[in-house]
Amino acid sequence: MASQGTKRSYEQMETGGERQDATEIRASVGRMIGGIGRFYIQMCTELKLSDYEGRLIQNSITIERMVLSAFDERRNKYLEEHPSAGKDPKKTGGPIYRRVDGKWMRELILYDKEEIRRVWRQANNGEDATAGLTHIMIWHSNLNDATYQRTRALVRTGMDPRMCSLMQGSTLPRRSGAAGAAVKGVGTIAMELIRMIKRGINDRNFWRGENGRRTRIAYERMCNILKGKFQTAAQRAMMDQVRESRNPGNAEIEDLIFLARSALILRGSVAHKSCLPACVYGLAVASGHDFEREGYSLVGIDPFKLLQNSQVFSLIRPNENPAHKSQLVWMACHSAAFEDLRVSSFIRGKKVVPRGKLSTRGVQIASNENVEAMDSSTLELRSRYWAIRTRSGGNTNQQKASAGQISVQPTFSVQRNLPFERATVMAAFSGNNEGRTSDMRTEVIRMMESAKPEDLSFQGRGVFELSDEKATNPIVPSFDMSNEGSYFFGDNAEEYDN
């Protein structure tokens, strides 16, 4: 983006730092990762988990959720003020799975939040280390993105379920800060804004008084975040209109839906980071890796190297395919839920199949499922190549896409043309073209119509051998363009339910 100079890098957002040079950034990200690892090791000790149990991704997720809950100030305050029967606001917990006599058993644990905060701070040099907490949130968000569809949520806000490639980060909590905002897709932020506007329409006091003033500031800030993701002047000008509206209502909702649709072709900039489960960082720290000294980057080769030699297990339900479970977690680790499957397959060195063809449900296991009938297997999280993660959407061109997802959001910085089906997308733009933003709308539509399939629309570096740590010899893969590229194609993924 042109305004690069004024932006902090994603890693700086991630670590809450001010301007730093590359080495300092690598060190502070490393410090954050090391803190997560040390915390995980300590929790495994407190819970008396065996080495094998500590590598179980379901146990990792429970421990991660406990620390997020322990630090969720607003919810903790709410729980204390609105006590509900049988819930201790000072405690948090979840299922821990243990191997007993050759079978898996579930044990529900409860912990003092204060105790968990103590362990977390101790692992992070006495600090609250919010960056590490956000990092864990992004990992959970990436896992949700790969596991669930957001069809219902899209339909509820008046958007088209085929716009799912714009919904990255839709389950991230509001408190995830700048690092969280960077990884949110255009559709996610449009949806948050639409929800706000709808509340304002239904509740006369929403924008009024001291609370209303705070709401207004949040609204304008969110508008600016969304504006910053768009790469064309017309889209940004429309965002200015939405932000400056005295009394946001249906006209603004229309504009936001229009803008979200336009992002299927004129793609926004959305950051991608490889965030791994806490147990992976724990394993590395336990084996003597000093993240802060070595430095670490979420967008380079480091996560690939870490996954090359980490053994993580997962519980597998009786009718699930372990290879498919591995694909799901691999996609989550690299934030590749909306990436072109051909690119993902090339990097992974194994065919990555669409969600509808996966015989696996989510990673987490419901409390009413019978764990004794389950086995565990190793997740195959290694890759054949590595590639730099991207923060831009690339400009687009056309190509036949599918009935499920009609566009992709690139994760890896690899040259390719980006599939989308112009006819399908443009059909969404017939109709409403009047109102204050008509000239901008016309301009946006004109740009979309002139997007050409011949252009190499995403200029990327290419992929690299895992031995090529400095990214010196890019390999530009050639893709069979007749092939299906989107993951949620013809989909039957489960809906995300809070």
Curated annotation (Swiss-Prot):
Keywords: Capsid protein, Helical capsid protein, Host nucleus, Host-virus interaction, Ribonucleoprotein, RNA-binding, Viral nucleoprotein, Viral penetration into host nucleus, Virion, Virus entry into host cell. One of its GO terms (molecular function) is structural molecule activity. A motif (Unconventional nuclear localization signal) lies at residues 1-18. InterPro entries: Flu_NP. Its main location: virion. Residues 8-22 have a biased composition (Basic and acidic residues). It is found in: Virion; Host nucleus. Late in virus-infected cells, may be cleaved from a 56-kDa protein to a 53-kDa protein by a cellular caspase. This cleavage might be a marker for the onset of apoptosis in infected cells or have a specific function in virus host interaction. A motif (Bipartite nuclear localization signal) lies at residues 198-216. GO terms for biological process: symbiont entry into host cell; viral penetration into host nucleus. One of its GO terms (cellular component) is ribonucleoprotein complex. Residues 1-22 are annotated as: Disordered. Encapsidates the negative strand viral RNA, protecting it from nucleases. The encapsidated genomic RNA is termed the ribonucleoprotein (RNP) and serves as template for transcription and replication. The RNP needs to be localized in the host nucleus to start an infectious cycle, but is too large to diffuse through the nuclear pore complex. NP comprises at least 2 nuclear localization signals that are responsible for the active RNP import into the nucleus through cellular importin alpha/beta pathway. Homomultimerizes to form the nucleocapsid. May bind host exportin-1/XPO1. Binds to viral genomic RNA. Protein-RNA contacts are mediated by a combination of electrostatic interactions between positively charged residues and the phosphate backbone and planar interactions between aromatic side chains and bases. Belongs to the influenza viruses nucleoprotein family. This is Nucleoprotein.
